Amino acid sequence: MWSFHPDRNIDLAFMPFKLIVEHCLALNRRPFFTSIESSTIPRDNELKELTTIEDVLMIGYPNGLWDEVNNIPFFMKGMTATHPGIDYQGKQEFAVHMPIYKGSSGSPVFLLSAQFYDRARSYVPGRDYVRILGIAYKHFKYLAEGMVWVMLDTYCACIFISRSSV
């Protein structure tokens, strides 16, 4: 039922949703869902307007955890560690600094600006600015001794490697 990206290096998959909705409706249950619209993909000029440090939000199911009673995923907040509009390490990627755990692979990472300002810094009360910036797929192994050893190519988001003790 899952369809995977043809490039094995790109950790994306999708499942046709229509059959699930039809099944729920046949059971006399109306499913609630929200979709990510194409209007949330930032244009090139929007990416150029961003700063290196931006607030980001990731929504997902780390280690399969979620609120089963209310059917709600986990929300993690952090910030960008590199500029989202500049290729990191020569790849069309950027790094984030946020709590990301094994099993978060495939979680969407959003730019979230809820400061009541538009991107031109004009005051707009009650208006949020949300854009999808990417999909989490890498993490670093952090040891209790305070060392970051290697970047793992599976799961989670990409963060800087630092070989220093705490």
Residue ranges and their predicted role:
Residues 1-102, 106, 111-114, 121, ...:
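Serine endopeptidase catalytic core focused on the charge-relay Asp
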Residues 134, 143, 155:
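C-terminal binding/interaction regions
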Residues 141-147:
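Short active-site-adjacent structural elements
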